[in-house]
């Protein structure tokens, strides 16, 4: 059995970690970075993930997808999705099942399918480090994710070829990373997690007793559509509005210009965490009849803070609610942990410190803590990490719709999971032979105001006056926060149950098709990589051979020289194509044709006093391999 890796599947960046001995280790990706941009780009030839995708975003805005986590498990008609449609350069479309999907080059792609590309990159990163196949993972989600969003994340893992052993809440994972090995007997911490697209706040109690650590989540809350992307959008709007005032041109109508503004806005926001002002300079951003237009704008930290202060204030309101739910006062919080890149903003740190009356901890890496905690949980599940008990909670209340369109709650929010709860209901009409169980998630009294998770029928109820049949409804939530619901007629013993999969979710058949597509793409990607390697080798051989012709070609016969140059030319032509076998055949042809060149080079070296020549790659594979390896390492 291999390792269980921990993956922080973030809105803006993702991170992967694994237990290395008794410590969790963050793994660097192929580009040498510890985090990977959660960006996916579809080009004519391949699918790019991470930094390569980000680099080409400006020239390919409609097919470069980012912040997909904000769409996962969401309905197309939802307010959040409709807001995103107005600002995203790519096309968000309505799927047949009512979900928000993305249209790329005429193909409709589901958010779990797109997110799976990032998970595959994380999986490959871990496999390259461990030197073995990875099939199991713990994946983190925002604590405030509802059931549909959790299911969609598990689906993304399946499509990526991962068995998702556990879904763990991001603040809980950060607490695990912070508290692992702590010797303090009892402490209550607040985890304030403001990431790229989501916000969570959790109050967690860490107990140490007789060598065992217990991490108990007392309460959690948040907003699954508040994060760094929203901060970026405020800056984007400001830049575009200022340019429109000056030039009377709306850059929102130009996808490429909008992508340039987005990159500049994110860069300006980051710079203003350490500087008091920054310049946004985008030459040739657009043009009109009078000629090209340049965008130049100074943004101060004070201006940025004015643009986003209401976003920060809304997060502080959530803090008050969660503290109340946890039954704790501000003075009872021992430590504050800041997680997520947006917490680097001085205004965020200031407002959190003002609320708690103390500074947050500075020794927790906001970009890596969640992945580290996920790896720790993987170690717990594997049995490699012992004496840790994790008690998480369900973030939202669960219940069913009852007479009058009311939501009757069976499981209150912030109930420790896994949990099981039953309640007996009855019929609303005389001789009713069936009941519909409509499962809801949320805090509103009116059923229609809550999230519908699905519904099912219990049929075959014996005719009886209203109120007489006894229908026992049971909610069972597993450790992933995924819900099973059953209804049983206590008189007849008939039972019906479902594992909640919202009507907006992917069917098993769709998931399996996406898994097959992913496997097919993986094979295509492998073949593409092999062709690139062959091209690199061909380029190295052609370069080295031409160099040696220049150095020793004067002692070659005209026929030999012409033959070698023709072979090199054919190799260079083959290297422009997609046929790996042809490229390799042309490499062999150059090596064979270059034998007289090698002999001439040796003869010339002996005449020069025995000095060893620079050997042709045609005879010395070491030279070629070194050149090829160097190219590979620099990727």
Swiss-Prot record:
<keyword id="KW-0597">Phosphoprotein</keyword>
<keyword id="KW-0067">ATP-binding</keyword>
<dbReference type="GO" id="GO:0005524">
    <property type="term" value="F:ATP binding"/>
</dbReference>
<feature type="compositionally biased region" description="Low complexity">
    <location>
        <begin position="599"/>
        <end position="617"/>
    </location>
</feature>
<dbReference type="GO" id="GO:0140662">
    <property type="term" value="F:ATP-dependent protein folding chaperone"/>
</dbReference>
<keyword id="KW-0346">Stress response</keyword>
<dbReference type="InterPro" id="IPR013126">
    <property type="entry name" value="Hsp_70_fam"/>
</dbReference>
<dbReference type="InterPro" id="IPR029047">
    <property type="entry name" value="HSP70_peptide-bd_sf"/>
</dbReference>
<dbReference type="InterPro" id="IPR018181">
    <property type="entry name" value="Heat_shock_70_CS"/>
</dbReference>
<keyword id="KW-0547">Nucleotide-binding</keyword>
<dbReference type="InterPro" id="IPR012725">
    <property type="entry name" value="Chaperone_DnaK"/>
</dbReference>
<dbReference type="InterPro" id="IPR029048">
    <property type="entry name" value="HSP70_C_sf"/>
</dbReference>
<dbReference type="InterPro" id="IPR043129">
    <property type="entry name" value="ATPase_NBD"/>
</dbReference>
<comment type="similarity">
    <text>Belongs to the heat shock protein 70 family.</text>
</comment>
<dbReference type="GO" id="GO:0051082">
    <property type="term" value="F:unfolded protein binding"/>
</dbReference>
<comment type="function">
    <text>Acts as a chaperone.</text>
</comment>
<feature type="region of interest" description="Disordered">
    <location>
        <begin position="599"/>
        <end position="635"/>
    </location>
</feature>
<feature type="modified residue" description="Phosphothreonine; by autocatalysis">
    <location>
        <position position="198"/>
    </location>
</feature>
<keyword id="KW-0143">Chaperone</keyword>
<dbReference type="Pfam" id="PF00012">
    <property type="entry name" value="HSP70"/>
</dbReference>
<protein>
    <recommendedName>
        <fullName>Chaperone protein DnaK</fullName>
    </recommendedName>
</protein>
């Amino acid at each position: 059995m291999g390792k269980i890796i921990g993956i922080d599947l973030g809105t803006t960046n993702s991170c992967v970690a694994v237990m290395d001995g008794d410590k969790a280790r963050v793994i660097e990706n192929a580009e040498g970075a510890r985090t990977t941009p959660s960006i996916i780009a579809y080009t004519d030839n391949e699918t790019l993930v991470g930094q390569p995708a980000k680099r080409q975003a400006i020239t390919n805005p409609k097919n470069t997808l980012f912040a997909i986590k904000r769409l996962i498990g969401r309905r197309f008609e939802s307010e959040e999705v409709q807001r995103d449609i107005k600002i995203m350069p790519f096309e968000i479309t309505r799927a047949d099942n009512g979900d928000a999907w993305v249209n790329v080059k005429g193909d409709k792609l589901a958010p779990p399918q797109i997110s799976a590309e990032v998970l595959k990159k994380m999986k490959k990163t871990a496999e390259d480090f461990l030197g073995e196949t990875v099939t199991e993972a713990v994946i983190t989600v925002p604590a405030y994710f509802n059931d549909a969003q959790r299911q969609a994340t598990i689906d993304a893992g399946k499509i990526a070829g991962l068995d998702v052993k556990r879904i763990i809440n991001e603040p809980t994972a950060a607490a695990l990373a912070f508290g692992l090995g702590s010797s303090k007997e009892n402490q209550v911490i607040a985890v304030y997690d403001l990431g790229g697209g989501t916000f969570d706040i959790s109050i967690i109690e860490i107990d140490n007793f007789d060598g065992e650590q217990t991490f108990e989540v007392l309460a959690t809350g948040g907003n699954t559509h508040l994060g760094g992307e929203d901060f970026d959008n405020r800056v984007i709007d400001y830049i575009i509005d200022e340019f429109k005032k000056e030039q009377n041109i709306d850059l929102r109508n130009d996808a490429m210009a909008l992508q340039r503004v987005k990159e500049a806005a994110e860069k300006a926001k980051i710079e203003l965490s350490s500087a008091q002002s920054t310049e946004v300079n985008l030459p040739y951003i657009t043009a009109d009849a009078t000629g090209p237009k340049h965008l130049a704008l100074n943004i101060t930290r004070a201006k940025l803070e004015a643009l986003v202060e209401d976003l920060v204030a809304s997060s502080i309101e959530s803090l008050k609610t969660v503290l109340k739910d946890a039954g704790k006062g501000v003075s009872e919080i021992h430590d504050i942990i800041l997680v997520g890149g947006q917490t680097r903003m001085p205004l965020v740190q200031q407002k959190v410190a003002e609320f708690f009356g103390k500074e947050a901890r500075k020794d927790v890496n906001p970009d890596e803590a969640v992945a580290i905690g996920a790896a720790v949980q993987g170690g717990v599940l594997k049995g490699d990490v012992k004496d840790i008990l994790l008690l998480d909670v369900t973030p939202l209340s669960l219940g069913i719709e009852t007479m009058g369109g009311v939501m009757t709650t069976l499981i209150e929010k912030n109930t420790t999971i896994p949990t099981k709860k039953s309640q007996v209901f009855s019929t609303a009409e005389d001789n009713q032979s069936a009941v519909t169980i409509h499962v809801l998630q949320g805090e509103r009294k009116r059923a229609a105001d809550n999230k519908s998770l699905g519904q099912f029928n219990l049929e075959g109820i014996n005719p009886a006056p209203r109120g007489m049949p006894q229908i026992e409804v049971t909610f069972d939530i597993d450790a992933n926060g995924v819900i099973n619901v059953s209804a049983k007629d206590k008189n007849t013993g008939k039972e019906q149950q479902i594992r909640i999969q919202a009507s907006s979710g992917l069917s098993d058949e769709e998931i399996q098709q996406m898994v097959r597509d992913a496997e097919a793409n993986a094979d295509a990607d492998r073949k593409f990589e092999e062709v690139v390697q062959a091209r690199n080798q061909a380029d190295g051989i052609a370069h080295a051979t031409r160099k040696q012709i220049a150095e020793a070609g004067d002692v070659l016969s005209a026929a030999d020289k012409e033959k070698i140059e023709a072979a090199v030319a054919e190799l260079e032509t083959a290297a422009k194509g997609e046929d790996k076998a042809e490229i390799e055949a042309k490499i062999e042809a150059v090596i064979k044709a270059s034998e007289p060149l090698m002999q001439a080079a040796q003869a010339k070296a002996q005449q020069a006093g025995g000095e060893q020549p620079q050997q042709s790659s045609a005879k010395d594979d070491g030279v070629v391999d070194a050149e090829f390896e160097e190219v590979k390492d620099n990727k």
